[in-house]
Amino acid sequence: GTDTIGYSPLILDISNISQGYLTAVSDGNGTTKNIQLSADDGVVYSYFVSSGESAVIPFTSGSGTYQVSCYEQVNGSQYAALFAQALEVSLENEFLPFLYPNQYVNFTPDSEACKLALSLLAEDATEQESIDTVFQYVTQHVTYDEDKAATVETGYLPDIDETLSTGKGICFDYAAL
């Protein structure tokens, strides 16, 4: 995009704020970056971006003022501040942050989960009928994974296709589906 903040080793593309997200782009310097996003509601969302990667970060608290604070890993779990900035977000539609793939809910039209969802839905289904159909499928075909819950590590991100193929998941996996 054309509207960015930050500098190497982390640049935030804020060109799509009105669509409900920003894109964090990390250069390939070998360190992990941490982006912390908080809104007026006080909830802080933390996103980690590996070296040379990018991540879509949604504005899930809706329109308002967000504080974005960016850090770079210096050693183990220690991070140094890179930059911080307040962002004014005015969404075109309150649902937009939830309609794009992001670090927590990563999907493409080619994802098995998307293909399955489309195969389950009738062409003339209403939005509510579609939601009900997918909900019923997930609750009938995915069971809670006690072992995974006991051993999950910090930084875990759901893989919706893996959850569907194994038929098991933890709360984060259910939420991503």
Predicted regions and their residues:
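N-terminal accessory/pre-domain segments preceding catalytic cores
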Residues: 1-128
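Secondary-structure boundary elements
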Residues: 101-166
